[in-house]
Swiss-Prot record:
Annotated binding of a divalent metal cation 7, by residue: C51, C64, C66, C67
Chain positions found as Phosphoserine: S33
Biological function: Binds heavy metals. Contains three zinc and three copper atoms per polypeptide chain and only a negligible amount of cadmium. Inhibits survival and neurite formation of cortical neurons in vitro.
Full protein name: Metallothionein-3
Family as reported in the entry's similarity comment: Belongs to the metallothionein superfamily. Type 1 family.
Residues involved in a divalent metal cation 6 binding: C38, C42, C45, C67
Annotated residues for binding of a divalent metal cation 3: C16, C20, C25, C30
Residues the entry annotates as binding a divalent metal cation 4: C34, C35, C45, C49
A Pfam short name: Metallothio
Origin superkingdom: Eukaryota
């Protein structure tokens, strides 16, 4: 079982199995990545990532890992 916890402070669910909708999700086995920024033009990002805040210049510095 995943050792990291996922309190889901912003709602959603994270079973550390296949869902990740928590801002503070640290589940290493979560199939979806928690990205700070998911550009709309990035289909893979929109499909496999859960965006959690960050807009403008701040988001630009934190490129979504799914797009790299």
């Amino acid at each position: 079982m995943d050792p990291e916890t996922c309190p889901c402070p912003t709602g959603g669910s994270c079973t550390c199995a296949g869902s990740c909708k928590c801002e503070g999700c640290k589940c290493t086995s979560c199939k979806k990545s928690c990205c700070s920024c998911c550009p709309a033009e990035c289909e893979k990002c929109a499909k496999d990532c859960v965006c959690k805040g960050g807009e403008g210049a701040e988001a630009e510095e934190e490129k979504c890992s799914c797009c790299q």
